[in-house]
């Protein structure tokens, strides 16, 4: 029988990497989270992401004063509701492929009149072209089977001059103890302790961003009009639809 002591650090790292890869592949098979998982997700992962999403909401309302914001994969609705509360002049719509998530989100947003939540697929958005001022997505693209299709839909629905801000996990930002300590101080204990694990499962490696995500973007109308850079706990991809 194998014991923990039989594995050296390198072997443990290989085991962890293999398990992480397996979990990520399992997560990508269902693009939506079924009902029991939706409730658990709303109570756990969103707790880790709460403070980082507050910052994103602040950045959005600073960028867009009036107009329509689309939250792709809005989940339990924290980010959408936070944006709507911060800026009553905005109309916010969250869309999610899980039927349970919009129900959870509507309960969270009760009393907030400028936000709505709908069931739908980010690869086939139920919105007219040139109708969205800014699209945002946090921690969703690692679930997406075809990022290119979602990027193309973002381009279609964005108004000329509009942007899409895509955030997803990037475990490299938690690589050193100093990085984990700094982010923990900035965003709370849970981010410092669990951020690396959450990002490894709910995100992409640097290599995957360069091959899978950049490769998909280069096949869309966003080619030459996007930026990809680490931002706090995330990798942030900024997409621009030129005027």
Predicted regions and their residues:
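A short His-aromatic
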Residues: 142-143
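Class I SAM-dependent methyltransferase SAM/SAH-binding core
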Residues: 76-124
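Conserved class I S-adenosyl-L-methionine
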Residues: 4-64, 67-75, 78-82
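A conserved beta-strand element that flanks and buttresses the S-adenosyl-L-methionine
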Residues: 136
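A short glycine-rich, Lys/Arg-flanked "PGG" loop and its adjoining helix->strand segment in the class I
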Residues: 148-160
């Amino acid at each position: 029988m194998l014991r923990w002591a039989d594995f050296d650090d390198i072997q443990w790292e290989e085991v962890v990497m293999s398990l992480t890869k397996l979990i990520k592949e399992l997560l990508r098979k269902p693009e939506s989270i079924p009902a029991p998982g939706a409730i658990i997700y709303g109570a756990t992962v969103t707790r880790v992401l709460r403070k980082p999403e507050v910052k994103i909401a602040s950045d959005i309302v600073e960028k867009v004063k009036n107009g329509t914001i689309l939250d792709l994969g809005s989940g339990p609705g924290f980010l959408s509701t936070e944006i709507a509360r911060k800026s009553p002049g905005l109309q916010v719509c969250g869309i999610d492929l899980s039927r349970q998530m919009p129900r959870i989100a509507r309960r969270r947003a009760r009393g907030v009149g400028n936000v709505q939540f709908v069931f739908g697929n980010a690869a086939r958005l139920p919105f007219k072209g040139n109708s969205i001022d800014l699209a945002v997505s946090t921690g969703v693209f690692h679930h997406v089977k075809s990022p290119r299709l979602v990027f193309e839909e973002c381009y279609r629905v964005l108004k000329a001059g509009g942007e899409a801000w895509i955030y997803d996990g990037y475990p490299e930002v938690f690589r050193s103890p100093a990085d984990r300590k700094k982010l923990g101080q900035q965003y709370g204990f849970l981010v410092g302790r669990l951020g690396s694990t959450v990002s490894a499962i709910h995100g992409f490696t640097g290599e995957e961003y360069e091959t899978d995500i950049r490769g998909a973007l280069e096949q869309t109308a966003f080619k030459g009009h996007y930026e990809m850079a680490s931002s706090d706990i995330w990798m942030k991809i900024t997409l621009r639809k030129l005027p």
